[in-house]
From Swiss-Prot:
Residues 14-341, 353-677 form the SAM-dependent MTase PRMT-type domain. Gene3D superfamilies: Hnrnp arginine n-methyltransferase1, Vaccinia Virus protein VP39. This is Protein arginine N-methyltransferase 7. The keyword Cell inner membrane does not apply. It is found in: Cytoplasm, Cytosol; Nucleus. The gene is prmt7. It is an enzyme of class 2 (transferase). One of its GO terms (biological process) is cytoskeleton organization.
Length: 683
């Protein structure tokens, strides 16, 4: 059965009504998931297997019959491990229907259907008894309910319910316990992702609103590959602190709680950020440990087991605080059902028993600007590029129109002396944030904010003025892939009749770049696994492949490549250019070509990004920020996501000119889509 669904088009800005199968969302979720990453996580799989074997041995040593409950079974891998380890029977719970179906197929293919029962329910809906989903309570509880924050997927309520209704008192648990660690640091790089900094523009200092400076920030965790944050980008104020542990073999409470750790400051500085991660002990003795600690905490960083389904967390303190070396401080972590947050105090006091309120944004800026967006707005070099470009084109009689979400460009244009500045801010919340910036800096009359879309704009909205400068970063909150910011082009086309004949467009053009790459690790999220710890999990590979094929074409996907090291195997190549000085054309734009491979390696796919030509002399890159090194090392813009086009399988390249990266792209103006195909061909 098919239904018509309204989907907002991030490139054209239109609401597209498309006919979709009722299975569309299922396939989208599977295609965008990273299930394969878990199966490729050898460290995780080996530790779980070892822990399960030990738990089964302990139950048998007590003279009991091992009965396992596996909550969040996924592929059924842990259940198959349990049965292979000697469990008598296993109840495997999986709430996501396509996943439960895949688990049933995998269990059957491996010959465990008589020992494993797949239950397609949420664990809190499972019943026990002669007519229930489970015939009896389990004496071994195996789970993989964790996310980067440990408890963000509802682990605590699930454990709480399981101990009350699904497992025996004194059951074995794998993992047996989890421990949260934290380190208080000063980091200019990371703090720029939390607060707006003063910005200098031609002798004017643009100050952040007081409400923004005093705001506790976004409530959600910032999860990143902390191993990619250079150690010289932060200074440790505290040692690594053990904040608290949860014993999963005993009844677990999901009630809000707080834990405090005292320490003496290792150095003076500004306490700004808490770096946090966790580990899980698979056995009571703590001999089998799976840790999320970043690579720089290892004696040998090369021994670090890469994974993307569990990363590390960055928490921003509500406000930065000055601390002195040797000062006694207290770091407190609090949690509710699903999230953690941290606070710092200097004074002596008793441990807080009741968790304080979870911090939340009160200024709206942290809801309008994402953390990478804060970093982008605080990027001095980037700001200088835009200011220099504006300085070169603005005149005293310039009438400017800005088209970008929550942008400071119109403020810059006013400070640089433009006669009139208008800015389209169709989001009411973004409009209020920019109003705060203008009010704080006594610029309220300098920029006229219009809460309408480009196609609604009229000459009356512009006080009868025609536009002499149309500008944009461009940045739009709805953009996922680099080329979604072509929405600027559609806005430019919509206001074409309001432009002066000789109007300047900034940026004047955009170029889509591509480079073939070998990923150090990111390939694991997309490449088939086949077998995992001796079990055939190929039905999972097939399910992911079917979901990827469900779309009409092989698509690129967004990733922040600064977190995922890769090596360039070709030179960066411009593959399509979009001329913003002209309106969006009626006919498709096509581009075909080939670029030789210059590096030897395994090509996993193609990285894609936009570069904007602000003027003839000034460009800003949303991708590579430096020339690729001779060895192929890439440095990526940390504030924007790049596109990645994964090949269906890795291809070996010689780098001696025998292979080319061939490309074929077509931009469809009516849909805003770029159909793309990349292949490796013999020269």
């Amino acid at each position: 059965m098919k239904t018509f669904c309204g989907r907002a088009n991030p490139t054209t800005g239109a609401l597209d009504w498309v006919e979709e199968s009722e299975e569309y969302d299922y396939h989208q979720e599977i295609a965008r998931s990273c299930y394969a990453d878990m199966l490729h996580d050898k460290d995780r799989n080996e530790k779980y297997y070892e822990g399960i074997r030990a738990a089964v041995r302990r139950v048998k040593a007590r003279g009991e019959r091992p009965v396992v409950l596996d909550i969040g079974t996924g592929t059924g891998l842990l259940s198959m491990m349990a049965v292979t380890a000697g469990a008598d029977f296993c109840y495997a719970i999986e709430v996501f229907k396509p996943m439960a179906q895949a688990a049933s197929c995998i269990v059957e293919r491996n010959g465990f259907s008589d020992k494993i029962k797949i239950i397609n329910k949420h664990s809190t809906e499972v019943t026990v008894g002669p007519d229930g989903d489970m015939q009896e309570r389990a004496n071994i509880l195996v789970t993989e309910l964790f996310d980067t924050e440990l408890i963000g997927e509802g682990a605590l309520p699930s454990y709480e319910h399981a101990h009350m209704h699904l497992v025996q008192t004194g059951c074995e648990a794998v993992p047996h316990r989890a421990t949260i660690y934290a380190q208080l640091v000063e980091s200019d790089m990371l703090w720029k992702w939390a607060q707006m900094r003063p910005i200098d523009v031609d002798g004017h200092r643009l100050m952040p609103p007081g409400a923004v400076q005093e705001c506790a920030g976004a409530p959600s965790v910032c999860d990143i590959q902390l191993s990619q944050v250079p150690t010289d980008a932060f200074t440790a104020i505290s040692p690594v602190c053990t904040m608290f542990s949860v014993d999963f073999s005993k009844p677990v409470s999901s009630a809000a709680q707080s834990y405090t750790v005292r320490f003496k400051s290792q150095t003076g500085g500004r306490a700004q950020v808490v770096l946090s991660w966790w580990d899980i002990d698979m056995d009571p003795e703590g001999n089998i440990v799976c840790t999320m600690a970043p690579s720089w905490s290892y004696a040998d960083p090369h021994a670090y087991p890469w994974r993307d389904h569990w990363m590390q967390s960055v928490y921003f303190l509500p406000a930065e605080e000055n601390v002195s070396e040797g000062e006694e401080l207290m770091l407190m972590v609090s949690h509710d059902d699903y999230s953690l947050w941290y606070s710092l105090t200097h004074s002596e006091q008793n441990d807080v028993r009741v968790a304080p309120f979870r911090p939340c944004c009160t200024c709206q800026a942290h809801l309008v600007w994402t953390r990478p967006r804060f970093g982008e707005l605080n990027d001095e070099q980037r700001t200088e590029s835009y200011v220099s470009a504006l300085r070169s084109i603005l005149k005293p009689d310039s009438v400017c129109l800005s088209v970008s979400d929550g942008s400071l460009l119109p403020v810059f244009a006013h400070l640089l002396g433009s006669k009139k500045v208008f800015s389209l801010e169709s989001s009411g919340m973004a409009k209020q944030v920019i109003e705060q910036v203008l009010h704080t800096n006594s610029l309220k009359d300098g920029v006229q904010l219009l809460g309408i879309r480009a196609e609604q704009l009229s000459l009356a909205d512009l006080d009868g003025n025609q536009i002499s400068v149309l500008m944009g970063e461009p940045y739009f909150s709805t953009s996922l892939l680099p080329w979604h910011s072509l929405f600027f082009w559609y806005c430019r086309t919509a206001v074409a009749q309001l432009l002066q004949p000789d109007a300047t467009i900034l940026p004047r053009a955009a170029t889509l770049y591509a480079v073939a790459v070998e990923f150090q690790d990111l390939w694991r999220i997309r490449f088939p696994c086949g077998t995992c710890e001796g079990f055939d999990v190929s039905p999972m590979d097939e399910m992911i492949q079917r979901s990827l094929d469900f779309r009409e074409s092989w698509e690129a996907e967004p990733h922040p490549l600064w977190e995922y090291p890769c090596r360039a195997l070709t030179k960066p190549c411009p593959v399509m250019t979009f001329d913003f000085t002209q309106c969006v054309p009626e006919q498709p734009i096509s581009s075909d070509g080939a670029v030789p491979f210059t590096g030897r390696g395994r090509c996993h796919g193609v990285a894609l990004w936009m570069e904007y030509q602000l003027t003839d002399d000034i460009s800003v890159s949303m991708g590579l920020t430096k020339a690729v090194s001779q060895e192929g090392a890439c440095e990526w813009n940390p504030h924007r996501k790049q596109g990645v086009f994964f090949f269906r399988s890795a291809k070996e390249t010689s780098g001696d000119g025998r292979e080319d990266l061939s490309y074929s792209l077509t931009f469809e103006p009516h849909s805003g889509d770029i159909k793309m195909d990349f292949s490796i061909t013999e020269s």
